[in-house]
C-alpha cells in the first residue's frame, strides 16, 4: 500500500494475507472462515502491540505522513461559518498559513494554522507548510484583530519550520517570528495552540505562545528535525533515528517536561486513518480548554500565559 511506514510492514503483510484468503474463500469450495477469523484476531493484537509501542522515530514518521489531516481539514469539521482572510497588509499573502474568523459552538473565534499541501502542486503553492515573513505577519494581523474584538484565538501548528530562503531573510524572517512571540504574550484573549503534526522550531513557536498548548498523540515538537540534529552532531543525516530517540520530541516527552498542557489521543494508526474521529477528539479538548480560559479576566489571561512560559526550562530554584 502507498504511504505506509516501515514499522507497519508486519501489519500490511498480515492484511494482505487475509485479503488473499477472503478472495480465495469466495471462489473456492473450501471454507476458510475459521482461518480468516483467527488471522483477524491476530491482526488486532498485532496492531495493538505495534501502535502502543511506537518509538520517537515511528511517531515522527506518522507526524509527517503525506495523508495526515491539515489545518483546513480540521477547520471544516470543527468550526462553523469560517471565512478565510488573506494578506499581511505589508507585502502579500502567504498560503503556508491560513486563518480567518469562525464560530465554535456559537462562540466567535479566530482560527489560524500552518497549511501543508495535499499533492505536489498544492505543496508548491503552500511552500510545504513553511511560512515566509508575510505568513507570520498575516497571522499577527488576525491575532490583533481578535484581541481588539475579544475573540479567542485557536492555532493549529504543523510545519517543518520557517522558510530559510534568502528572500525570507531579506524580508525579516527572524523579526517576524520574534514580533509574534512578543505580541502574543500580551494578548487579552484566550489563546489555544494545538500541534497537529510537526512542530518545527521558530516556525512553530510563532503560533505557539498559548495559554494552553496541546499535542496530538503522534505529533512532535522540537527545535530542529532529527535529520538536522544528526547532520550537526554526527555529520550524518542517516543517524536521524538515533537523534529522534534522544531529542525528546514526542507528545509524552513535552508533557512530562511541562511544556505542553495535554495530549490529545489519536485513532489507532494515526490521525490519517479516521479524520472524523480525530476531529471529535480535538473538539473535546478545545471545548474544555475554551470553557476554562473564558472564565479568566484579561489580566489573568496575560499573567497565566506569562507564568506558564517563565517556568519552562526551570529545573530548580534557590
Swiss-Prot record:
Protein known as: Acetyl-coenzyme A carboxylase carboxyl transferase subunit alpha
The EC number(s) this enzyme carries: 2.1.3.15
A GO term from the CC aspect: acetyl-CoA carboxylase complex
Main localisation: cytoplasm
Top EC category: transferase
UniProt family annotation: Belongs to the AccA family.
Pfam families: ACCA (PF03255)
InterPro entries found in the cross-reference section: Acetyl_CoA_COase_a_su, ClpP/crotonase-like_dom_sf, COA_CT_C
Coiled-coil portions: none
Pathway in which the depicted protein is active: Lipid metabolism; malonyl-CoA biosynthesis; malonyl-CoA from acetyl-CoA: step 1/1
PROSITE patterns membership: COA_CT_CTER
GO MF assignments: acetyl-CoA carboxylase activity; ATP binding; carboxyl- or carbamoyltransferase activity
Gene Ontology biological process terms from the UniProt entry: fatty acid biosynthetic process; malonyl-CoA biosynthetic process
The keyword Cytoplasm is assigned to this record: yes
Subunit details: Acetyl-CoA carboxylase is a heterohexamer composed of biotin carboxyl carrier protein (AccB), biotin carboxylase (AccC) and two subunits each of ACCase subunit alpha (AccA) and ACCase subunit beta (AccD).
Residue ranges constituting the CoA carboxyltransferase C-terminal domain according to the UniProt record: 31-292
Reported function: Component of the acetyl coenzyme A carboxylase (ACC) complex. First, biotin carboxylase catalyzes the carboxylation of biotin on its carrier protein (BCCP) and then the CO(2) group is transferred by the carboxyltransferase to acetyl-CoA to form malonyl-CoA.
Annotated PANTHER family: ACETYL-COENZYME A CARBOXYLASE CARBOXYL TRANSFERASE SUBUNIT ALPHA (PTHR42853), ACETYL-COENZYME A CARBOXYLASE CARBOXYL TRANSFERASE SUBUNIT ALPHA, CHLOROPLASTIC (PTHR42853:SF3)
Superkingdom in the source lineage: Bacteria
Catalytic activity line of the entry: N(6)-carboxybiotinyl-L-lysyl-[protein] + acetyl-CoA = N(6)-biotinyl-L-lysyl-[protein] + malonyl-CoA
Entry keywords, A to Z: ATP-binding, Cytoplasm, Fatty acid biosynthesis, Fatty acid metabolism, Lipid biosynthesis, Lipid metabolism, Nucleotide-binding, Transferase
Cellular localization per UniProt: Cytoplasm
Protein's organism: Listeria monocytogenes serotype 4a (strain HCC23)
